Amino acid sequence: MQAEAADWFSSMPFQKHVYYPLASGPEGPDVAVAAAAAGAASMACAPPSAASGPLPFFQFRPRLESVDWRRLSAIDVDKVAGAVDVLTLQENIMNITFCKLEDEKCPHCQSGVDPVLLKLIRLAQFTIEYLLHSQEFLTSQLHTLEERLRLSHCDGEQSKKLLTKQAGEIKTLKEECKRRKKMISTQQLMIEAKANYYQCHFCDKAFMNQAFLQSHIQRRHTEENSHFEYQKNAQIEKLRSEIVVLKEELQLTRSELEAAHHASAVRFSKEYEMQKTKEEDFLKLFDRWKEEEKEKLVDEMEKVKEMFMKEFKELTSKNSALEYQLSEIQKSNMQIKSNIGTLKDAHEFKEDRSPYPQDFHNVMQLLDSQESKWTARVQAIHQEHKKEKGRLLSHIEKLRTSMIDDLNASNVFYKKRIEELGQRLQEQNELIITQRQQIKDFTCNPLNSISEPKGNPLAWQAFESQPAAPAVPMNAPALHTLETKSSLPMVHEQAFSSHILEPIEELSEEEKGRENEQKLNNNKMHLRKALKSNSSLTKGLRTMVEQNLMEKLETLGINADIRGISSDQLHRVLKSVESERHKQEREIPNFHQIREFLEHQVSCKIEEKALLSSDQCSVSQMDTLSTGEVPKMIQLPSKNRQLIRQKAVSTDRTSVPKIKKNVMEDPFPRKSSTITTPPFSSEEEQEDDDLIRAYASPGPLPVPPPQNKGSFGKNTVKSDADGTEGSEIEDTDDSPKPAGVAVKTPTEKVEKMFPHRKNVNKPVGGTNVPEMFIKKEELQELKCADVEDEDWDISSLEEEISLGKKSGKEQKEPPPAKNEPHFAHVLNAWGAFNPKGPKGEGLQENESSTLKSSLVTVTDWSDTSDV
């Protein structure tokens, strides 16, 4: 009970600490107690807001009743507590709650009630009154809930009735749906079958087969059936006639359609062909337009690139000018700061101060703003330039790759072409070799019939052992002329005996090997001539060589458009080339042998060229000495004259076959150098005539003027073709000029003549003239070795022209004569061709430039000869 009472008190509906009691109902205390119990039970599960209607204002009632002491004394409290007698409490609750105890006094002492006890009793009365009010409220709530429950029960009953009714309706609807579904399925079957059901013409019925329909008609439509049959037959006949007409029309329309279809097919084919041709023309135009646009784009890009480069150069120049101006301004500022005068007082300094400081500040701000603006603009231009440069570089790289592909394709074509031409050249070379062999057989026959020269061998030895006397200058005095007159005939006899009286020797093994090498050189020269005759092939080879060189340089990290590289990069490239060379040495077993063989070939060619040039120099020197050393008339005895004539004729006859052999073996004579005079000029013919008259007639001989250095340069640099042609012409014209032919001996004889004289009669302080000319001709031969390769090397030719002009200018003045004794004349004879001070320096410079130009010339010569 205590727990129930606690729950009951805890669930009382307080509203803002104010309770609103309801009016007491007419029920008695029993009903109230039952209602209180029911209310307590319902409040345990219902929320306080479940009460409906406004809550009345609660207020405690005044205590006006007196205490019924007799009834109270009659109640046994222990019994009520033990039996839980609620009814007794209900009977006395009103008297206890609303009695007034303030006026009550003790019957014995007549004293009033203790105030604390009175307070306790009053609180208990208030509590009971509140509990009564709560009981009334709960009872009213219970009544409302019961009413609502009753209404809900009524609604439930009605809902049940409605559910049963709807269930019946649903059942009937399901049956109707099943029936209609079956009907729809049958109709669908009939619609799908089409001819499987038969519709009655007189009613709406349909049947699954014809028998059912006939039975239906006979049973239901007997009279109508006969009339229908008649109509049906008439309709059938009408339909048949219409069908025949329609078939004819169909046949006619079919033929017309076929003709129209054929015509349309022909028209479509023609239109398709026209459209195809138009598309092809359009594609060609489009490709052409695309190429034109590409070319325009490339041109525009080049123009834009040039414009940007110009702007960049202008900006750089402006920037450098501004930097220079800034540096000048800074220097001037430093000078102004350093040139401060004497110190002044404060008032003087204020007086001297500028009256416009604000303007200066504004100008400085304006300059700063302009500088920032220009720097920003320059940075923007730099960024745009970098972007444009990157785009152009990418486009250039694409174009370069495409060009490399095209060049590779053209290289393959040219390689095949070169192989074909090489085969043809090989066949022609074989034919030429056979013809040369036949010519050699024809020319070798006269060598076997040559007889030994007539004369006394002791006289040859005497002539050869005596040294040659030096030349006498033109302006020497008469005394020296008389002293040397007796020795002049002997000198000239010795000079001509050295040319005429040497015996003819057979060809040695070295000369035979040299002839074989000359044949190979002639074959290679024929190849070079064939390449020169076909200029397009030479240009193609040149482009191929340039392309290969560019590719090799690019593989080594050197671009083609670079003008120079640093030393570090050069060392790196040389290291890479050296490593590649070592790699090739490891891959090729006979690498060193091949290299030595090639070096030997090149050195042999250079030596051969040098020997040929030295031979020409020796012949020219002997011509010069023979014409320049005869100062007076010479009276030769008749015996000596006859001996000279005999030896000249025999020597000329013996030397002709070898010269002719050389001429016939060289079908492609070399071009003469640009600094030489044409062969057989009028001056040389005049000199030869003078020599012939001097040595053939006993009369007086006029002294010719001394040859200057310019004429010597002309005579010393003659080609092989000049020498061979001169030999042939002089051989044909043998009888009128025997002595003149004897002067031009073979070059091998002159070369053999100089070594045994080189250290015999050379005076102290003199210069060996033949050795000097041999060295000089070696240098000149390096220059003129590849004159025929003009397409490959133009720079060396230009240097030769300039060198020839310079040497011609320097060598125009004749050597000055001196009135000295005979020993001085000997020194002058040996040092006649020794250049002096400034001329020697010019010669050295010419030699260095010649050597520099000959480096390229020799390499080109070796490359073209190996092709």
UniProtKB/Swiss-Prot annotation:
Subcellular compartments: Cytoplasm, Cytoskeleton, Cilium basal body; Cytoplasm, Cytoskeleton, Microtubule organizing center, Centrosome, Centriolar satellite; Cytoplasm, Cytoskeleton, Microtubule organizing center, Centrosome, Centriole; Nucleus
Subunit architecture: Interacts with DAZ1. Interacts with the BBSome; recruits the BBSome to centriolar satellites of the cilium. Interacts with PCM1; localizes DZIP1 and the associated BBSome to centriolar satellites. Interacts with RAB8A (GDP-bound inactive form); recruits RAB8A to the basal body of the cilium and prevents its inhibition by GDI2. Interacts with GDI2; negatively regulates the interaction of GDI2 with GDP-bound RAB8A. Interacts with GLI3; retains GLI3 within the cytoplasm. Interacts with CEP164. Interacts with IFT88.
Residues bearing the modification Phosphoserine: S226
Any one cellular-component term (Gene Ontology): ciliary basal body
Name assigned to this protein: Cilium assembly protein DZIP1
Keyword Cytoplasm: yes
Coiled-coil intervals: 230-340, 401-445, 568-588
Region spans: Required for interaction with DAZ1: 154-278
Biased composition (Acidic residues): 722-733
TM region(s), chain numbering: none
Domain of life: Eukaryota
Zinc fingers (C2H2-type) by residue: 198-221
Function: Molecular adapter that recruits protein complexes required for cilium assembly and function to the cilium basal body. At the exit of mitosis, localizes to the basal body and ciliary base of the forming primary cilium where it recruits and activates RAB8A to direct vesicle-mediated transport of proteins to the cilium. Also recruits the BBSome, a complex involved in cilium biogenesis, by bridging it to PCM1 at the centriolar satellites of the cilium.
Pfam families, sorted: Dzip-like_N (PF13815)
Protein family according to the UniProt entry: Belongs to the DZIP C2H2-type zinc-finger protein family.
Keywords in alphabetical order: Cell projection, Cilium, Cilium biogenesis/degradation, Coiled coil, Cytoplasm, Cytoskeleton, Developmental protein, Differentiation, Disease variant, Metal-binding, Nucleus, Phosphoprotein, Spermatogenesis, Zinc, Zinc-finger
Compositional bias per record (Polar residues), positions renumbered to this chain: 643-654, 671-680, 708-718
Start-end of Basic and acidic residues biased regions: 807-823
Molecular functions per Gene Ontology: BBSome binding; molecular adaptor activity; zinc ion binding
Record PTM: Phosphorylation at Ser-226 by PLK1 before mitosis prevents interaction with PCM1 and localization to centriolar satellites. Thereby, it negatively regulates the localization of the BBSome to centriolar satellites.
Disease link: Mitral valve prolapse 3: An autosomal dominant form of mitral valve prolapse, a valvular heart disease characterized by abnormally elongated and thickened mitral valve leaflets, that typically show myxomatous degeneration with increased leaflet compliance. It is associated with mitral regurgitation. Myxomatous mitral valves have an abnormal layered architecture characterized by loose collagen in fibrosa, expanded spongiosa strongly positive for proteoglycans, and disrupted elastin in atrialis.
